[in-house]
Amino acid sequence: YHDKLTGLFNRTYFEKKLEKIEASGVFPTSIIIGDVNGLKITNDIFGHGEGDELLKAIARILEKSCRKNDIIARWGGDEFSVILPETDYETARRICERIKKICETYKDLNIQPSIALGLDTKENNTQKLKDVVKKAEDRMYRNKLLESKSKKSGTVLSLQRTLFEKSYETEEHALRIIELSQKLGRMLGLHENELDDLKLLAGL
């Protein structure tokens, strides 16, 4: 019932635990669903080894942010989920804030880790936990869209810093190449996400 890469519980365990809590009738129960920002671009630029390190860092951040009785699982490739038993919405919201804060100050990785989060709470017996999970997931995707521009910019800057550190050329030269690539990209009518990718490639 454990994920080999992160050591967290896997999705099967998460779903079994949901069923058990549902049957017990315990509430409030809060659910957090998270999706790692920048995993694909990290894999593309630095390889899957660096992407794995990002996933492991997020797992450690979740463990540090949550409490002993919370159930933390790797839900999918870049998704994580947390069950917070007997936890109201406000307490769960503060845990989400803690996750964000630790991500922002995390120093043990080449890139800055970040994760989009969604939260919902079962507050009475008329609610089903599967619906709470769905609502938390929907909120996560909405938050990811709202945050995507700023978070992607942060990921790009973080990756650029790493590229500069790994490069034998001067940072000034790399910045000139990036500036020229951006001008060319705009002349070609590239979209913002394509310009971001071009910016990273120009720094290689």
Predicted regions and their residues:
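Conserved long alpha-helical elements within nucleotide-processing catalytic cores of c-di-GMP signaling
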Residues: Y1, G7-S30, N37-R67, A73-G77, ...
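Active-site-flanking beta-strand signature of metal-NTP-handling nucleotidyl enzymes
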Residues: S30-D35, I72, V156-R161
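Catalytic-core segments of nucleotide cyclases and related cyclic-nucleotide turnover enzymes
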Residues: H48, R93-K100, E104, K122-K149
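Catalytic strand-loop-helix junctions within cyclic-nucleotide turnover domains
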Residues: I83-A92, L109, A116-V132
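Catalytic core regions of nucleotide second-messenger enzymes
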Residues: R74, I102-D120, S148-K151
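Acidic/His-rich, divalent-metal-binding segments that scaffold phosphate/diphosphate chemistry
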Residues: A136-L204
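The cytosolic transmitter module of two-component sensor histidine kinases
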Residues: N10, G51, L55, A92, ...
